[in-house]
Curated annotation (Swiss-Prot):
Gene that this sequence comes from: fusA
Keywords tagged on the record: Cytoplasm, Elongation factor, GTP-binding, Nucleotide-binding, Protein biosynthesis
GO BP, sorted A to Z: ribosome disassembly
Organism: Xanthomonas axonopodis pv. citri (strain 306)
Cellular component GO terms held in the UniProt record: cytoplasm
Listed name of the protein: Elongation factor G
Length: 705
């Protein structure tokens, strides 16, 4: 089957923002204007198409990235048809993983900002993630109809807080209740959308007299930004004082693709104004898969390899999300980077070294689906029937193997015990948690060997609340949850601490003999960056002359690695330690892998105790937005929680307080902040780093452990 849309007319982009910027409403309007959705869904009434999980509709926040395919031929229907694959991403910090995984497979992003709130703490987190993957992006300043809306202020914040070279493509006509439309700086015309048709029709008018000077100045700034793309454009601009519409677009596009500039649009998704022109901007300014560099990976011989975004190249794709669907079972969302795949084809998963047959291929439209026969380079789709694929795995052609770079997922910082309410929930709970962990790599499940309890770990309280909620709704499992527990770590402060341990048992028959001498030191920053570091632990073999035979060295390392999973202080994982194997001895008959494993384990425990062991606690970067009236109470409370204030900023809702606070002090903070501020203050937090816990905390944790 021939390709219906050339790859140059594909746009794979994400819609990103902080909570309450109006991201889901913006996505809804996109679906409405591209003809996918015949009725506009509102978040207020829980009918939004993109927020398809029950909990999302109840809580009014987006949790999982829903992928949708739509088509666009321009606001005035004059463009050739473009194919959009849109991914809606959550804005809550506990779901940063969803943003991260969608960024990995996108070519561009639309950054939605609130015209009142501007650049929020969460915006900075999302922006940093987009920088990490060099994602070209444009901004849409939403909610221009709201009281306090200020387009210029948000553009300034983009520059000051995010370091973006923001280039307005429009200026708003009016603001708040008086917001009427926008001035298109390319055409130097005012755009007015028709209210009766919900914005599906529009007309160009002359620019209002009071905006002519503002628009002229803004246009000069835009043209200058375009001219800086190349010497030819700059020469023409300097000689003639202007550029054609086509030249401006080509210069701006070139610079957007290089992530040098961020074009800025504005509107009110809720009032059906502005999203339409922003979609034209997606076509003009964001990349197609063919504009992005070829995807990089490693071939069978561990050599670097690339795949160009063409249908004729060997097939390669990245599985970026696994979901459990009530009707079809497990769905694997994947992005095709090169080649073609037909339903029924076999694919190879080099990460698991397994072949799998792709059953059905589904094109997803939020929670509706359409079955398709094939996918090609640039497509995003979902496969049914893949059993062993996990998030971040590569799928490729069996005869041309490539392993694409895996995704890096953050370590969970909070844990809690869960237990089934009834015997019949017991079995179902294990299956439910297994499925949910397969879907979400930032969520972990383990069994505590001593207590036999099931421990779940995640990125924050909300994250774990929603997991427990999903168990109930999707798997009918009722569970009791314990108090959240902090994921502490253990490490040492003293360097070059020697520990000598001989494991010897000789009581007739074959004995056991393993003898090791190790040196423990804290890892340096340099060492932490080395390729040999795994799980934040470095093993160095300094044995020469066969004092310990080569075949026993891996057993020594294995013994050490097994021991660091549960540290000697309170049973938390050991991090940041380098162990050097410096000496030892062996017995021709009695030495075995097990004996050396045990010797290494005991030597480590004894050495750790002598090396000034300390407990580390996770420190969270917390941003609190509070009205001035409550500032004293809020800041006093931060100090009581052992918080360190990092500074303050102004915000339309009062003051933004930045602080570093230990996670152990943050449980139940949402409730106490609400009561302190009569529900008017908000906060967001993300993990920042580990640091040494004070002695009283370490003692309390040790006693509990």
């Amino acid at each position: 089957m021939a390709r219906t849309t050339p790859i140059e007319r594909y746009r794979n982009f994400g819609i990103m923002a902080h909570i309450d910027a109006g991201k889901t409403t913006t996505s809804e309007r996109i679906l409405f204007y591209t003809g996918v959705s015949h009725k506009i869904g509102e978040v207020h009434d829980g009918a939004a198409v993109m927020d398809w999980m029950e909990q999302e509709q109840e809580r009014g926040i987006t949790i999982t990235s829903a992928a949708t395919t739509a088509f666009w031929s321009g606001m005035d229907k004059s463009m050739p048809q473009h194919r959009f694959n849109i991914i809606d991403t959550p804005g809550h910090v506990d779901f940063t993983i969803e943003v991260e995984r969608s960024l990995r497979v996108l070519d561009g992003a639309v950054f939605v900002l609130c015209a009142v709130g501007g650049v929020q703490p969460q915006s900075e987190t999302v922006w940093r993630q987009a920088n990490k993957y060099s994602v070209p992006r444009m901004a849409f300043v939403n909610k221009m109809d709201r009281t306090g809306a200020n387009f210029d202020k948000v553009v300034e914040q983009l520059k000051a807080r995010l370091g973006a070279y923001a280039v307005p493509m429009q200026v708003p006509i009016g603001a708040e209740d008086g917001f009427e439309g926008v001035v298109d700086l390319l055409k130097m015309k005012a755009i007015h959308w028709d209210t009766a048709s919900q914005g599906t029709t529009f007309e160009y008018r002359d620019i209002p007299a009071d905006l002519v000077d503002v628009a002229t100045e803004a246009r000069s700034f835009m043209v200058e930004a375009a001219a800086e793309a190349s010497e030819d454009l700059m020469d023409k601009y300097l000689n003639e004082g202007d550029l054609s519409e086509q030249e401006i677009l080509s210069g701006l596009r070139e610079r957007t693709l290089k992530v040098e500039i961020v074009p800025v649009f504005c509107g009110s998704a809720f009032k059906n104004k502005g999203v339409q022109a922003m979609l034209d901007g997606v076509v003009h300014l964001l990349p197609s898969p063919a504009d992005r560099p070829p995807v990089q990976g490693i071939d069978e011989d561990e050599k670097e390899d690339t795949r160009a975004a063409t249908d004729t190249a060997p097939f390669s794709a990245l599985a970026f999300k696994i979901m459990t669907d009530p009707f079809v079972g497990s769905l694997t969302f994947f992005r095709v980077y090169s080649g073609t795949l037909n339903s029924g084809d076999q694919v190879y998963n080099p990460v698991k070294s397994k072949k799998e047959r792709v059953g059905r291929i589904l094109q997803m439209h939020s929670n509706n689906r359409e079955e398709i026969k094939e996918v090609r380079a640039g497509d995003i789709a979902a496969a049914v029937g893949l059993k062993d694929v996990t998030t971040g795995d590569t799928l490729c052609a069996q005869d041309k193997i490539i392993t694409l770079e895996r995704m890096v997922f953050p370590e969970p910082v909070i844990s809690m015990a869960v237990e089934p309410k009834t015997k019949s929930d017991q079995e179902k709970m294990g299956m439910a948690l297994g499925r949910l962990a397969q879907e979400d790599p930032s969520f972990r499940v383990k069994t505590d060997e001593e207590s036999g309890q099931t421990i779940i770990s995640g990125m924050g309280e909300l994250h774990l609340d929603i997991i427990v909620d999903r168990m109930r709704r999707e798997f009918n499992v009722e569970a009791n949850v314990g108090k959240p527990q902090v994921a502490y770590r253990e490490t040492i402060r003293k360097s070059d601490v020697k520990s000598d341990y001989k494991h010897a048992k000789q009581s007739g028959g074959k004995g056991q003999y393993g003898h090791v001498v190790i040196e423990l030191s804290p890892m340096t920053e340099e060492e932490r960056k080395s390729d040999n570091v795994k799980d934040d632990f470095l093993f160095v073999n300094d044995i020469t002359g066969g004092i310990i035979p080569k075949e026993f060295i891996p057993s020594v390392e294995k013994g050490l690695r097994e021991t660091i999973t549960s540290g000697p202080i309170a049973g938390f994982p050991v991090v940041g330690v380098k162990v050097k194997l410096v000496f030892g001895s062996y017995h021709d008959v009695d030495s075995s892998e097990m004996a050396f494993k045990l010797a290494a384990s005991m030597a480590f425990k004894q050495g750790f105790a002598k090396a000034s062991p300390v407990l580390l606690e996770p420190i969270m970067k917390v941003e609190i937005v509070s009205p001035e009236d409550y500032l004293g109470d809020v800041m006093g409370d931060v100090s009581r929680r052992r918080g360190v204030l990092q500074g303050q900023d102004d915000s339309p809702s009062g003051k933004i307080i930045n602080a570093m606070i230990p996670l152990g002090e943050m449980f139940g903070y949402a409730t106490s902040l609400r009561s302190m501020s009569q529900g008017r203050a908000t906060f967001s937090m993300e993990f920042d780093h580990y640091e040494e816990a004070p002695a009283n905390i370490a003692d309390a944790v040790t006693k509990k452990g």
